[in-house]
Amino acid sequence: MDITELLAFSAKQGASDLHLSAGLPPMIRVDGDVRRINLPPLEHKQVHALIYDIMNDKQRKDFEEFLETDFSFEVPGVARFRVNAFSQNRGAGAVFRTIPSKVLTMEELGMGEVFKRVSDVPRGLVLVTGPTGSGKSTTLAAMLDYLNNTKYHHILTIEDPIEFVHESKKCLVNQREVHRDTLGFSEALRSALREDPDIILVGEMRDLETIRLALTAAETGHLVFGTLHTTSAAKTIDRVVDVFPAEEKAMVRSMLSESLQSVISQTLIKKIGGGRVAAHEIMIGTPAIRNLIREDKVAQMYSAIQTGGSLGMQTLDMCLKGLVAKGLISRENAREKAKIPENF
């Protein structure tokens, strides 16, 4: 059995992930549900060989030393995959996340005009947040693609690993992969400020240093896109501020209130008739919102988003209601994801 055959099968089924796990048959995740492929269980040696074949020496060394490693892998004509190889109680395991080879446009994803407005801001910080596998990378790729088609800018991305590959259209695009082209997010961000970028994408704002540098880049006139694993705008503000020591919190609130342009928190929901659709909470950095951030009144943010509909803001529940009204998702699925389920 060949890994490229398994990955081609997985992509053909529209799977978001392929799971290999010693002692079990291969499995795929389709529309959010994990399903078994009708094949015999794989032994440890088989899984080990399948993943070793596609690793380079550095990745093999990492895997042996740290018992896990991340890398990306491309099957030409099929798709690119983000791979995590690990060890588990029955032996080796690996997960291949499908990255479609084509960047979907905002129109194809059904993203509203507000996403263009958010992308068009000249400088500041735009955060796209949500749990793992909620489509953050897809949303960001569409926003970068829109800019790549409409502006004459330098786009610099720092990713671990590179997911969507952007060709330079109107923009110059440089994509840097952590551990391959740079030692880490903070190192790459530090030198980014000397690389004349207009737009910087930070794949993950994991630690204090990366968040600090991203805020500085946004303050110094760059448009910075970043991702966090938070599930709402309010939690995102708290998360960023909480990373800093007590004596810096007031300063960070002030920096955020100046530079934050938007927080888009998203989740994926099963569509009626198959497939999934993204639902978004959208917060825009209006003077009222900036004030709430500065004065640490994050609890009042939800009602500010509710009343900011004319400015393009929406709560997750407002978005879910719209998707139910369009007949895209069922009431039951909306209720599962809603902040206030009784509204459904």
How would you name each of these model-derived features?
Residues 1-344:
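Short, flexible helix-loop junctions that flank or precede catalytic/ligand sites
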